């Protein structure tokens, strides 16, 4: 049981980080295009 909880926590954290990186990159691209 403890092993299953750790595995579920690992993929969830990686997906959250990737989503944040994409949002930051999209915002930076918009700022550069506006400038």
Curated annotation (Swiss-Prot):
Keywords: Chromosome, Developmental protein, Differentiation, DNA condensation, DNA-binding, Nucleosome core, Nucleus, Phosphoprotein, Spermatogenesis
Source superkingdom: Eukaryota
Post-translational modification, as annotated: Phosphorylated in immature sperm. Dephosphorylated in mature sperm allowing a stronger interaction with DNA.
BP GO terms, sorted: cell differentiation; mitotic chromosome condensation; nucleosome assembly; spermatogenesis
Modification Phosphoserine occurs at: 9, 21
Subcellular location: Nucleus; Chromosome
Entry GO CC: nucleosome; nucleus
Gene Ontology MF term list: DNA binding
Region Disordered, residue ranges: 1-35
Expressing tissues: Gonads.
UniProt function note: Protamines substitute for histones in the chromatin of sperm during the haploid phase of spermatogenesis. They compact sperm DNA into a highly condensed, stable and inactive complex.
Note: Two isoforms exist, a major form and a minor form. This is the major form.
Protein name, UniProt field: Sperm protamine alpha isoform 1
UniProt organism field: Scomber scombrus (Atlantic mackerel)
